[in-house]
């Protein structure tokens, strides 16, 4: 449902503008096309035409990755984030529509639905406002006010409220103050009159305690007290009154936490020591602090409350229902105070507790999904033979040797560390495996004994004695010619150039210890988070039914180096350890966001159709578990796919699914080279025409900058009609879906400066497209509603570098060899580190002492930082300075200020 976030000025202004929009949803519960799109366009500040196009595509069954990648003309070039925002708001609108239908049905059954009330409900676009409208009609348990109504006291209560709104001056004489109340009481007979008149001394104006007089003696189950209960409930259900209290919470709510005394000295409570006596304005409370307090509350350690200035709020409420002074005014004032304390304030406090938790959840989920995206898009090593080592002491180091496809070749356990200390046997075994299985890289888990294992492996790879330090540099082994390899200084260690480094090391070794020619096997530290959970999962048991959990864990570590994305999709993202308070947030929202993130990453990278696992295929646009399983079955029965067209032969994979998935699936050895690119099959005819016009094959065209420079882009542009629908007509079909031949040529309206043969080797494709765009009328832009510029731009970019991997290249990293434990740290020393987690309050960095240090957001950069992800990324190699070390709590404070990265 659409919810306010009621403690921010920006949100307050935004909500007011949304209320003023006054757009309605139809009775069906589905957002009406025009009004729904208009509301989304207004809320997200996006063009209405683009929003309408996205909603149309979503309703046609298109996925977000497909829309953002292959329908840029129709959406005006909206990116994946914007399309996701549209989709999520549209879903909330649909939920709001369903809630309206439920409310209308309930009120209709009570025979209280008027045309005005129905129109008001339809016009409401905010869930909080909708619930306020519904509150007087909402079925309740038997309240004090209902008991009073059953005794016929509602007319009396309404009469008192009406009289209290009439301005009156304070009586000059005490005996005149009760005249109005007496006249009201004369209209009512029975116990109600007797009870109320006996408790209110007519003739003496009874003022409330807050006004300086004695409080009214109305209490218990008397009819008079029950009449005031009716007034209190009426006030509590008044939308204006509730908004008055909300405004007070928006502007001045304070969240407070205090430790429960009996828990203060327990070990479990110490992690919440910062919140034993804590208070802060709610609007300034960061999500991680709020979630920490709520966790402490859930564990029975903290007591958390949200408060406002009650006296000021009661005064504001009273002015809404009382004018002047008198007995009726005093009675209503007392009822208003009772309403605030007993009904409104607890309700609004609970509302703000819920909404603040939702806001904190959203921020925590955002941090988690961004970290997950960075982790999934970590650079892969690629198809190399890998030796994976899961380090350990007493239980030994588990080793798995993998081939280029990640298949298990061999596994065993070595014991180079205490208590066994079988260094010689372990060294011989390691060298034997490297040579036997032609190992090209080594992956070591970053858990227990990781530093010791990395040093052991490094010594085993080098036949020379251990390196010694000389004046801040490593002592260098002699080359066969007696030369020296220039080693890197401390400042260089965080960012090694892998190919250059391997070349230097290779030249220094005699002979180099590597399974294949080209230098020593590089060593990488790999995160173990989630590996143990994967090794015991049904997925791992299905993949390796005959191996134990330790071997499966080592295999997972090796595969994470080869292709992090392909391996991590098998693991529950919550087990990967890159979030903050992920177990405290709304789990359904978290799962939805994480699934969307995984799908986005998988489709951004693309998937090898012939080697992808079931889990990887599941996240491909348009597929899902059932179709992914059918693809695996088809592949097992018929062998590898040779073309994308074969996908149509897969069971239950129809035209729609093919359209959605084809562009994201790659076939490296396909007959048509475009099948191994991001060019969608619906655009093959454009590339075919380009090749035909250049009198070459598609294979010759791909990657050939000279030929690409000769392409006259204007020849392949197709005019696009405006997105706006007029007179009920459907939007014109996307020209990218045209079949049969190249798009018609546009008339010449100006020359495009074509490049000479001398310029073609230095083709700058973006610049070339920019020149073409500037020469066109209309310009090469999806937003103009003109040519298919975005699609052509993507096609030409893909032809220049087909099948490129957006994830970059993996880098070698080295910890400081002098630092192994907390006791080795010295305040002020600079160290290399790896970013292991990012939160909205800073980043955690592994510096090799088995305890990550925190770089607070204020220490991330020399400039002011509001979002850590703007200056740092997960697994980034950084240099940090030690600021503080707390040995008792095992906490390390680090800084990146004034350090060149």
Where are these regions (language model features)?
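Short flexible coil/turn linkers enriched for glycine and charged/polar residues
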Residues: 47-48, 60-61, 127-128, 141, ...
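Glycine-biased, low-complexity coil/linker segments
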Residues: 29-30, 174-177, 208-211, 219-221, ...
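A glycine-rich phosphate-binding loop feature that marks nucleotide/adenosyl-phosphate handling sites
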Residues: 247-254, 389-393, 447-449, 526-533, ...
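Single-stranded RNA-binding regions, centering on S1/OB-family and related RNA-binding modules
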Residues: 675, 681, 686-717, 764-768, ...
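Duplex nucleic acid-engaging cores and interfaces of nucleic-acid transaction enzymes
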Residues: 2, 66, 82-85, 92, ...
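Compositionally biased, intrinsically disordered low-complexity segments enriched in Pro/Arg/Gln/His
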Residues: 5, 173, 196, 217, ...
């Amino acid at each position: 449902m659409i919810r306010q976030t009621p403690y921010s000025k920006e949100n307050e202004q935004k909500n007011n503008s949304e209320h003023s929009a006054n757009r309605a949803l139809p009775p069906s519960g589905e957002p009406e096309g025009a009004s729904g799109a208009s509301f989304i366009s207004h809320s997200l500040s996006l063009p209405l035409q683009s929003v309408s196009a996205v909603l149309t595509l979503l309703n046609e069954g298109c996925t977000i990755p497909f829309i953002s990648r292959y329908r840029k003309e129709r959406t005006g070039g909206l990116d994946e984030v914007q399309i996701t925002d549209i989709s999520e708001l549209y879903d909330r609108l649909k939920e709001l529509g369903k809630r309206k239908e439920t409310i209308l049905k309930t009120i209709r059954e009570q025979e209280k639905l008027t045309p005005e009330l129905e129109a008001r409900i339809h016009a409401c676009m905010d869930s909080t406002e909708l619930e306020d409208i519904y509150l007087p009609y909402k079925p309740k348990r038997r309240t004090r006010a209902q008991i009073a109504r059953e005794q016929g006291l509602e007319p009396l209560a309404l009469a008192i409220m009406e009289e209290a709104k009439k301005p009156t001056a304070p009586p000059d004489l005490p005996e005149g103050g009760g005249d109005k109340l007496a006249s009201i009481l004369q209209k009512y007979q029975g116990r109600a009159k007797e009870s109320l008149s006996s408790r209110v001394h007519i003739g003496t104006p009874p003022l409330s305690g807050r006004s300086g007089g004695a409080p009214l003696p109305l209490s218990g189950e008397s009819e008079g007290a029950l009449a005031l209960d009716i007034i209190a409930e009426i006030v509590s259900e008044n939308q204006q009154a509730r908004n008055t209290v909300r405004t007070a919470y928006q502007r001045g709510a304070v969240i407070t936490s205090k430790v429960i005394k009996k828990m203060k000295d327990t070990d479990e409570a110490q992690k919440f020591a910062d919140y034993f006596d804590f208070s802060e304005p709610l609007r300034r409370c960061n999500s991680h602090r709020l979630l920490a307090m709520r966790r402490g509350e859930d564990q029975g350690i903290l007591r958390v409350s949200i408060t406002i200035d009650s006296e000021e709020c009661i005064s504001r409420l009273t002015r809404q229902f009382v004018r002047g002074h008198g007995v009726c005014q005093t009675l209503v004032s007392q009822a208003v105070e009772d309403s605030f304390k007993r009904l409104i304030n607890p309700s609004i406090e609970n509302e703000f507790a819920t909404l603040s938790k939702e806001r904190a959840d959203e921020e925590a989920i955002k941090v988690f999904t961004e970290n997950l995206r960075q982790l999934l898009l970590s650079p892969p090593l690629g198809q190399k033979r890998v030796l994976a080592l899961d380090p350990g002491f007493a239980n030994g180091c588990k080793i798995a040797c993998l081939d280029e496809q990640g298949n298990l070749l061999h596994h065993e356990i070595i014991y180079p560390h205490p208590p066994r200390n079988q260094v010689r046997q372990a060294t011989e075994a390691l060298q034997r495996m490297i040579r036997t299985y032609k190992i090209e890289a080594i992956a070591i888990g970053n858990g227990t004994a990781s530093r010791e294992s990395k040093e052991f492996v490094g010594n085993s790879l080098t036949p020379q004695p251990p390196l010694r330090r000389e004046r801040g540099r490593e002592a260098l082994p002699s080359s066969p010619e007696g030369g020296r390899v220039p080693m890197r200084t401390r400042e260089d260690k965080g960012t090694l150039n892998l190919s250059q480094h391997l070349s230097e090391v290779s030249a220094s070794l005699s002979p180099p210890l590597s399974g294949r020619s080209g230098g020593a096997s590089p060593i990488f530290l790999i995160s173990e988070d989630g590996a143990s959970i994967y090794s015991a999962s049904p997925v791992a048991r299905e993949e390796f039914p005959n191996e134990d959990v330790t071997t499966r864990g080592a295999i997972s570590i090796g595969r994470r180096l080869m292709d992090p994305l392909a391996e991590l999709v098998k693991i529950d993202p919550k087990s990967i350890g890159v979030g903050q308070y992920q177990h405290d947030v709304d789990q359904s929202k978290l799962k939805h966001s994480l699934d969307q993130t995984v799908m986005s990453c998988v489709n951004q990278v693309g998937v090898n159709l012939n080697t992808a696992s079931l889990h990887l295929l599941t996240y491909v646009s348009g597929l899902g578990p059932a179709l992914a399983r059918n693809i695996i079955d088809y592949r097992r029965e018929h062998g590898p796919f040779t073309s994308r067209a074969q996908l149509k032969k897969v069971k239950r994979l129809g035209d729609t699914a093919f359209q959605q998935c084809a562009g994201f699936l790659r076939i490296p050895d396909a007959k048509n080279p475009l099948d191994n690119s991001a060019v969608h099959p619906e655009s093959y005819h454009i590339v075919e025409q380009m090749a035909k016009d250049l009198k070459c094959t598609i294979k010759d065209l791909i990657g050939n900058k000279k030929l690409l420079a000769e392409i006259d882009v204007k020849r392949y542009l197709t005019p696009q009609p405006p997105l706006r629908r007029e007179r009920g007509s459907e939007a014109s079909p996307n020209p990218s879906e045209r079949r049969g031949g190249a798009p018609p040529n546009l008339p010449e309206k100006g020359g495009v400066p074509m490049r000479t043969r001398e310029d073609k080797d230095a083709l700058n494709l973006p610049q070339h497209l920019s020149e073409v765009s500037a020469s066109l009328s209309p310009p090469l832009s999806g937003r103009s509603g003109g040519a298919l510029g975005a699609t052509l731009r993507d096609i030409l970019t893909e032809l220049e570098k087909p099948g490129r991997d957006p994830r970059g290249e993996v880098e070698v990293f080295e910890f400081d060899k002098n630092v192994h434990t907390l006791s080795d740290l010295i305040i002020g020393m600079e160290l290399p580190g790896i970013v292991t987690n990012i939160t909205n309050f800073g980043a955690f960095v592994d510096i090799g002492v088995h305890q990550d240090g925190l770089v607070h957001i204020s220490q991330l950069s020399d400039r002011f930082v509001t979002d850590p992800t703007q200056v740092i990324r997960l697994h980034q190699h950084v240099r940090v300075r030690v600021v503080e070390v707390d040995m008792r709590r095992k906490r390390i404070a680090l800084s990146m200020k004034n350090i060149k990265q």
